[in-house]
Amino acid sequence: QENSTAYHRNHESQHRNEFVTSNQDIKRALDIVKDVPLFDRTKQDIHDTILRLDNQITKVGVFGTFSAGKSSLINALLGDNYLVSSPNPTTAATTELSYGKESQITLKSKEQLLEEVNHVLEFYEISFNTLDDFIESDLDKLKLKLEKNQLAFISAIEKHYEMYTSMLEHSLIHTVSLEEIKKWSAEDEYATFVKTVHLKLPLDWLKGKIIIDSLGLHSNNQRHTNETEQILTSSDLILYVTYFNHSFTDNYKAFIEHMKDMNQLNENQAFKMIINAVDLAEDKQDIQAVEDYVADALGQVNLHSEIYSVSSR
């Protein structure tokens, strides 16, 4: 037994030394290419991953369609309704939760906001070269064309553009109180301007974790798609939340196939399937039937995952 214990200690020590060596090699490589004006996003992702590894922090990406109950699931894990999300996919922002006391918001840059304005108006064959051009246009006439969610987005920019530009002059990142976080997360007229909400809570359960409440899938927003892919590629654990009454739609299947096309779900990542709102089930047999259906659907895309049935109420 002593020989076995010594063997395991030596084995662990060898792996630890290999990890440290690899980590140092990557840091040196990053230092060499840091001034090369290419692949900035990739370089930043690698840097962030190394920082998390150094500090032994696990990044958990929570995914699902816009109404799957991701936020309610995270709140259930946290033990209170800390997380409030916008009901409007057009104005929604990614929320990043971690241990701490000072919460922050990262605003969209003018370029990002302009891109979203033009995306919303693309169907109407309208575009603007600058946000100032947009603000100076006939917005009353423009708003007559828009759907409800689009109208909320455009009206928010019209109403608070001066506030937004004033905040940008100081910084992209602003510290806000826990009470204000809810405003910037869930109210269209403020959430419109937010790229990321950094919610920090002094909860022991969050120590050693970063939890990302990703934007809803298939939102027809290129920024949302880009951010979803970035979170996917950098998460250590992927939780995929589906709703009991529509447990595996074509959209879910397309997303999982897209993950596999991106070469995600590799050996270093864990994937768990969460069926939310099982309190809607008639009985245990009803739950089992849905679990079997989801397992079969996952098998059809060659993915075999642990499935958890929960109620976030």
Show where each model-derived region lies:
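Charged, amphipathic alpha-helical linker segments immediately N-terminal to NTP-binding catalytic cores
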Residues: 1-37
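N-terminal pre-Walker A segment at the start of P-loop NTPase domains
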Residues: 23-54, 188
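Globular "head" domains of long coiled-coil molecular machines
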Residues: 52-313
